[in-house]
Amino acid sequence: MTTLKKTLRWTRAAWAAGCAMLCSAGAMAQEVIPVELPDERNMIGAGAFAVPDFYGAEDYHAEGAGFLHVNLGNGLWLELLGQELRLNVVPGYVGQNFQQLSTVRAGFIYRGRPSRDTDVDDEVVQRMRRLPVASELGVFASYSLPMPGDHPMHKIVFSGDAAWSTNTAYTGAVGNIRATYFYPFPQGLGGKPLLGSAGFGLFFSSDHFNEHYFGIQGADLALYPELGGVPFRPEGGLTSIRIPVSLTSQLGPHWSLTVAGRYERLLNDAADSPLVRTRGNENQWTLGAAINYYF
């Protein structure tokens, strides 16, 4: 099979897998699984994660997530991370005068943001108005800063994205900025390569986004008598900080195991929402593991 045919085959598979995962967004409680791929090898994987019942919830449940990275040639790639699909459109090489592009990636992002419905443990939240699935389209960019040493995986990746709802679930933009440090341990488990990562990120959102997910108004006011009938309309801005960590152990030439987690602390009006203060928790966790196959 020619390289072109292989690329086309895996591209079709990537789109199919991406659509399947994104169409299931209504069941997912987190829009972004805390896994960041450290390199650009062709890969397919699957994992299970404990995620909050809804954004700001106290209770958790298990969900599955799929992963896929397909190289399209000359540094272009398509990547699926749970409910997030990314297409890098920056070529890896465009001539000797632009070698620095090998550390820069940018392109388009499509994300499914989950619904909030009656499938939660909290009895009050079960009776609140249902929030439909939101789909988001936007852009992303990242820069990889090599760290001292000869190992290409020893680096800091600075990244950011901005997206807008495509189905009028909310208005205004949401965005992330983050830095992730990757460290290849000199001695791994059983002599196998071991890669660790830790990051820090900020999540920003619009007024309408926070009002949509954290606001209390309309018929929901009767469920929160402490508000005295006064709607709670949170403002946007800095909504949370996010701290992801992961460990990836190579199991063989084609297999690896990743254990990952993320702590998220809701801030400002999001943390002050009665939905979070009385029915949930401002401390949000995502924990899980995934098995990956490189091809």
Regions found by a protein language model. Name each.
Residues 69-71, 86-90, 97-98, 140-146, ...:
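Transmembrane beta-barrel domains of outer membrane proteins
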